[in-house]
Amino acid sequence: MGATDQALEAESKTTEPPKTPPVPEQHDRPFLGRQANLCHLLVLLFSGGLAAITLHIFTSSNVGWRLRQLHHLPTAHYLQTRDEFAVYSVDELNAFKEFYDRSISDSVGSSYSEAEETNIKEALGALRLAQDMYLAGKDDKAARLFQHSLALAPRHPTVLLRYGEFLEHSQRNIVLADQYYFQALSISPSNSEALANRQRTADVVQSLDERRLESLDSKRDALSAIHESSAALRRAKKEAYFQHIYHTVGIEGNTMTLAQTRSILETRMAVDGKSIDEHNEILGMDLAMKYINASLVQKMEITIKDILELHRRVLGHVDPIEGGEFRRNQVYVGGHVPPGPGDLALLMQRFERWLNSEHSSSMHPVNYAALAHYKLVHIHPFIDGNGRTSRLLMNTLLMRAGYPPVIIPKQQRSKYYHFLKLANEGDIRPFVRFIADCTEKTLDLYLWATSDLPHQIPMLIQSTSEAGEGVPQLQSSQMGGGASIPEFHESGSGSLP
């Protein structure tokens, strides 16, 4: 090799570029990028899914909570108390109503437990047998079988409908029949039979209710025509005062007899063998009644403060710390869960507005008073004394309309609570009729005691166990000391025999 060739070879070696590391194949770069993007995407999807699950749980719990709050409010019924009490806006209520209606429909078609299935099968069997007895003309046996079927399946639409039809056509009790049709319709809103039955009975029942109220007005007017100076009227008022306190504390479980109640109120002396609380319950009712007579009857409007003052006197001797104060804890009343303490202020403000509204005051006094009673006891604003305060408020409204304070007999305690339960389930009319019945019996007591009638009528005096205790009893203006008002029985009609 020549010198020139060697020089060129050396030059080529010196000018050769330095070797670089091998470059990865082109398909490796996108793979690494895709791997990173996939990780980012997975993280994003996981975060989004977690957020969605959290939002779903929050929304579901919030809807469930709001629906549970709606359970605190009276359901839609004849007097539409839920709308008047609503804590929420109309849009919220409409939205929740869809969930509420759907939950009712689902509950009707939901699976039953084994015990419930057994009861339903037995109830339907008894129902078929009852219908056979009815068609055979054996109404007494049919009635017992219908009642047995209802006891086994009290919320089965078919049982309610068949028993209602039996009451309507065989027993001629269209009012109670309509009540069962209403209940069946509330459980199964699309039930065509229930709709048809209600269309047939609703107007008739409403007319009967209105005529009943007119009858009460007539008796009230007859009582108002008696001059205040009448000695018989004064005696009747005094006796009714003792009875009212005796029965209203008796509903709450007080075991004092009428004679003992009278003795405590007249002498302020303790009764042996009875608890201090039972004495104090009677004294508290006495204070509350005097407050009504001195202040509330003359007032044009009833305020929250008035209700608190009423309650303060009811519990004044039993629990002076809680008296006149809204409760600060959640309470439970049987199957009813009243609103939480945080809702009480708003609910009571709305109740006060309803209580003094033109719409409410234009109702018949008995309807107005009964509904006020129900609304207040449904809110259950106090830790104790809600029933007594609600009954006192009811009587305040009745007294402002010229009625005497209504006596709800403690012997009818179970009926009283049953009708409140029916009102919670959607139909307040049975409770209003119950109050109307007690109003009529109280009016009859006054009219009989101030009349010259030589005969007696069922009255509200005492339980059978107290008969013969030497309790002073009402006497008519014509009767001698040997004649007294007999015991009141739950089945009494309240009308003159």
Swiss-Prot record:
<dbReference type="GO" id="GO:0016787">
    <property type="term" value="F:hydrolase activity"/>
</dbReference>
<keyword id="KW-0472">Membrane</keyword>
<dbReference type="InterPro" id="IPR003812">
    <property type="entry name" value="Fido"/>
</dbReference>
<feature type="repeat" description="TPR 2">
    <location>
        <begin position="157"/>
        <end position="191"/>
    </location>
</feature>
<feature type="region of interest" description="Disordered">
    <location>
        <begin position="468"/>
        <end position="497"/>
    </location>
</feature>
<feature type="binding site">
    <location>
        <position position="424"/>
    </location>
    <ligand>
        <name>ATP</name>
    </ligand>
</feature>
<feature type="binding site">
    <location>
        <begin position="384"/>
        <end position="391"/>
    </location>
    <ligand>
        <name>ATP</name>
    </ligand>
</feature>
<feature type="transmembrane region" description="Helical">
    <location>
        <begin position="38"/>
        <end position="58"/>
    </location>
</feature>
<keyword id="KW-0548">Nucleotidyltransferase</keyword>
<dbReference type="GO" id="GO:0016020">
    <property type="term" value="C:membrane"/>
</dbReference>
<feature type="binding site">
    <location>
        <begin position="333"/>
        <end position="336"/>
    </location>
    <ligand>
        <name>ATP</name>
    </ligand>
</feature>
<feature type="repeat" description="TPR 1">
    <location>
        <begin position="123"/>
        <end position="156"/>
    </location>
</feature>
<dbReference type="InterPro" id="IPR036597">
    <property type="entry name" value="Fido-like_dom_sf"/>
</dbReference>
<feature type="region of interest" description="Disordered">
    <location>
        <begin position="1"/>
        <end position="30"/>
    </location>
</feature>
<feature type="binding site">
    <location>
        <begin position="416"/>
        <end position="417"/>
    </location>
    <ligand>
        <name>ATP</name>
    </ligand>
</feature>
<feature type="site" description="Important for autoinhibition of adenylyltransferase activity">
    <location>
        <position position="252"/>
    </location>
</feature>
<dbReference type="GO" id="GO:0005524">
    <property type="term" value="F:ATP binding"/>
</dbReference>
<dbReference type="GO" id="GO:0070733">
    <property type="term" value="F:AMPylase activity"/>
</dbReference>
<keyword id="KW-1133">Transmembrane helix</keyword>
<feature type="domain" description="Fido">
    <location>
        <begin position="302"/>
        <end position="437"/>
    </location>
</feature>
<feature type="active site">
    <location>
        <position position="380"/>
    </location>
</feature>
<keyword id="KW-0378">Hydrolase</keyword>
<comment type="function">
    <text>Protein that can both mediate the addition of adenosine 5'-monophosphate (AMP) to specific residues of target proteins (AMPylation), and the removal of the same modification from target proteins (de-AMPylation), depending on the context. The side chain of Glu-252 determines which of the two opposing activities (AMPylase or de-AMPylase) will take place. Acts as a key regulator of the unfolded protein response (UPR) by mediating AMPylation or de-AMPylation of Hsc70-3/BiP.</text>
</comment>
<dbReference type="InterPro" id="IPR040198">
    <property type="entry name" value="Fido_containing"/>
</dbReference>
<feature type="binding site">
    <location>
        <position position="252"/>
    </location>
    <ligand>
        <name>ATP</name>
    </ligand>
</feature>
<dbReference type="GO" id="GO:0018117">
    <property type="term" value="P:protein adenylylation"/>
</dbReference>
<keyword id="KW-0808">Transferase</keyword>
<keyword id="KW-0677">Repeat</keyword>
<protein>
    <recommendedName>
        <fullName>Protein adenylyltransferase Fic</fullName>
        <ecNumber>2.7.7.108</ecNumber>
        <ecNumber>3.1.4.-</ecNumber>
    </recommendedName>
</protein>
<keyword id="KW-0812">Transmembrane</keyword>
<dbReference type="InterPro" id="IPR011990">
    <property type="entry name" value="TPR-like_helical_dom_sf"/>
</dbReference>
<feature type="short sequence motif" description="Inhibitory (S/T)XXXE(G/N) motif">
    <location>
        <begin position="248"/>
        <end position="253"/>
    </location>
</feature>
<keyword id="KW-0547">Nucleotide-binding</keyword>
<keyword id="KW-0802">TPR repeat</keyword>
<dbReference type="Pfam" id="PF02661">
    <property type="entry name" value="Fic"/>
</dbReference>
<comment type="similarity">
    <text>Belongs to the fic family.</text>
</comment>
<comment type="subunit">
    <text>Homodimer.</text>
</comment>
<keyword id="KW-0067">ATP-binding</keyword>
